[in-house]
Amino acid sequence: VVTIVCLDLGYTLKCNKLVPLFYKTCPAGKNLCYKMYMVATPKVPVKRGCIDVCPKSSLLVKYVCCNTDRCN
């Protein structure tokens, strides 16, 4: 008798891509979702995805990071 056991050893985070209808599963080590947009147009995201460290925002670009599935 052969028994195969599959264990999920880690939580996998899912982050939205630029179009929120689509998402991707983040690779190991990238445990944040982010959304980047221009300060002048805050309702129009420029980029979304997975990241390891949330970048600092600037006068022109704002980053919003979170750590739950599809929160970006």
Curated annotation (Swiss-Prot):
The keyword Protein biosynthesis is assigned to this record: no
Residue pairs linked by disulfide bridges in the UniProt entry: 15-33, 26-50, 54-65, 66-71
Family under the similarity heading: Belongs to the three-finger toxin family. Short-chain subfamily. Type IA cytotoxin sub-subfamily.
Domain of life per record: Eukaryota
Protein localization: Secreted
Naturally occurring in which organism (per UniProt): Naja naja (Indian cobra)
Gene Ontology MF annotations: toxin activity
Subunit structure: Monomer in solution; Homodimer and oligomer in the presence of negatively charged lipids forming a pore with a size ranging between 20 and 30 Angstroms.
Designated name of the protein: Cytotoxin 9
Tissue specificity remark: Expressed by the venom gland.
Signal peptide residues on this chain, from the entry's feature table: 1-12
